[in-house]
Amino acid sequence: MISIIDDDRSVREAVKSLIRSLGYEAVTFASAEEYLGADGAHESECVITDVQMPGMTGMDLQDRLIADGYRRPIIFMSAMSAEDTGATAASRFLRKPFSDERLIDCLDRALKSPPPNSCRS
C-alpha cells in the first residue's frame, strides 16, 4: 500500500490514479494528522507527502514516523525547491509540477533501495 498525503485534492487524486495504474494499492489523506490517525498507516510500503500543509508539515510527519520506528521510504512533493523546504540531500524529493515518468522513477527507486536515496527533480 502506498499512502499519499496532500492538502490539495486534485494532487492526491492524480497521484493515486497513477499509482493504481502501476498495480499498487493507494490510499489518500488530506493531512498528516489524518494519516497518523488511520488504522494501518505504519504498514505503508511508501509514503508520498506534500511538504507544506496546514498543521503538521511533511517534514514534521517524517520526524514523527522515524520516532515511531517507521523505516520505509518517504517521498516529498513541493512546489518549492528541496533547499527551500529543508529537505536533506538524502531525501526523495519531487518538485511540483512533475511528470508521471518522474514519479514512477522516484517510486521505483524508493521501493527497490533502502532509505536514504535521492531522486531529485
Regions found by a protein language model. Give the residues of each.
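Two-component/phosphorelay signaling modules centered on CheY-like receiver
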Residues: 9-27
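Acidic, metal-coordinating helix/loop segments flanking the phosphotransfer/catalytic sites
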Residues: 28-46
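Receiver (REC) domain active-site loop signature in two-component systems and cognate sites
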Residues: 53
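C-terminal output helix
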Residues: 98-111, 115-120
